[in-house]
Amino acid sequence: MSATINPHQVLTFFVAAAFIRLTVGAVTTFRIVPGEGPPRRSELVSLGFWAMLIEGTPVQLNSWLVVPGCVGMVGALVLFDWARRSIRGQYFSYVFSNDIPTMLWTGGPFAYIRNPFYASYLLAMASVALMMPSLIRLLVFAGAAMLLTSAARHEERKFAQSPLSSEYEPYKQRTGRFLPKILA
């Protein structure tokens, strides 16, 4: 009796492994600001991330969207790891924290986009919604996109009010929030 490979299980394993990698990366990259707990909105993004995986809508794997979805997921992992290597073991605060920025990263993916970590999460979630389309996954992605856009704006306000504001404004003008600026 030969074992058959179930493509749905392979895809689910791939996505779960990618999500675990991103989750472990987040836990080892982001720190809670002393005196603050993790913001509830941060927890919502994390829950949405995992809800996309466990949502039980059947998947049509003959869809032509699986390949670009897998490429997007690999891209999300590469972007996340590139950003982690670029900060050289330093820690970022959790989303929506109220700390004052003390460093402006401009190397690696930060040279092109201001929020490569958020961009990698959005790319991963968009990839899952593409590979395993369902209304629930699409709604979770849309909600996460709104929350992470709000988080990015919050970070931008913190930088604008910090001692780094004179460095941040030109940086903001030459980089995109989640995607590189095409025209300078």
Give residue ranges: language-model regions.
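Membrane-anchoring alpha-helices and their flanking helix-loop junctions
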Residues: M1-T106, A124-A184
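Histidine-centered phosphotransfer motif of kinases
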Residues: T106-G107, A111-A119
